[in-house]
Amino acid sequence: MTVDPIHQFEIQRYVELLRVSGVTVSFTNSAAFMVGIVALIFFFLTYATRGRTLVPGRMQSVAEMGYEFIAKMVRESAGTEGMVFFPLVFSLFVFVFVANVIGLVPYTFTITAHIVVTAALALLVIGTVVIYGFYKHGTHFLHLFVPSGVPAFLLPFIVLIEVISFLSRPISLSLRLFANMLAGHIALKVFAFFVVGLGSAGFLGWLGATLPFFMIVALTALELLVAILQAYVFAVLTSIYLNDAVHPGH
């Protein structure tokens, strides 16, 4: 039996939409899952918030808790003025959270285990910071790279460090989510193949597979925790970065 833990991340083309100069634009399994995740979130929130009552039901309670959780996060990270970004942070958190959790279901596709997806989300965040920062503050936004109280002879080096740090944000933001989801799913797949391989050896094989099986259960629980934490970390860092667009001064 051949173990290919990378096969689960393979992009499959469903429909070719466009071909220009040898470059093909297709509707893939990744795109299908992204559309499905957005549709699932939309229908859940629509159903949960319809006919809102003073005493909320279970689904309304989940929606309200999610709202309050993200709203508190944004206020603490970017202040009251930062609430203008609440829709963005809430959408990113819910999207990453649902994508991570759905990716744990067998025979599904983990879109956040693809660097192109996480990089697009990270660039959306940093692009929003830059565009809103210049829109709101003009050239004063550049004060983000000039800390106050720095001696003049050190200023060029500090500015260079600040610029490099800012440019590294989308890289670290995308790689963190991508690497955690990729590594965890590969580990689960390897252990699963190991259990199946031992089980095919008969009774003694199944006895030997007992420990790896429980390790799979533990790894699955850990992966669920990681899926939730990574969505939380992504949202927290997004809020912190957006604070620079609201308050660019050090």
Curated annotation (Swiss-Prot):
It comes from the Bacteria. Signal peptide: none annotated. It is found in: Cell inner membrane. Keywords: ATP synthesis, Cell inner membrane, Cell membrane, CF(0), Hydrogen ion transport, Ion transport, Membrane, Transmembrane, Transmembrane helix, Transport. One of its GO terms (molecular function) is proton-transporting ATP synthase activity, rotational mechanism. The chain crosses the membrane at residues 25-45, 84-104, 115-135, 141-161, 187-209, 223-243. GO terms for cellular component: plasma membrane; proton-transporting ATP synthase complex. PROSITE patterns: ATPASE_A. Its main location: membrane. It is a multi-pass membrane protein. F-type ATPases have 2 components, CF(1) - the catalytic core - and CF(0) - the membrane proton channel. CF(1) has five subunits: alpha(3), beta(3), gamma(1), delta(1), epsilon(1). CF(0) has three main subunits: a(1), b(2) and c(9-12). The alpha and beta chains form an alternating ring which encloses part of the gamma chain. CF(1) is attached to CF(0) by a central stalk formed by the gamma and epsilon chains, while a peripheral stalk is formed by the delta and b chains. Belongs to the ATPase A chain family. HAMAP family: ATP_synth_a_bact (MF_01393). Key component of the proton channel; it plays a direct role in the translocation of protons across the membrane. NCBIfam families: ATP_synt_6_or_A (TIGR01131), PRK05815.2-4 (NF004482). This is ATP synthase subunit a. It comes from Azorhizobium caulinodans (strain ATCC 43989 / DSM 5975 / JCM 20966 / LMG 6465 / NBRC 14845 / NCIMB 13405 / ORS 571).
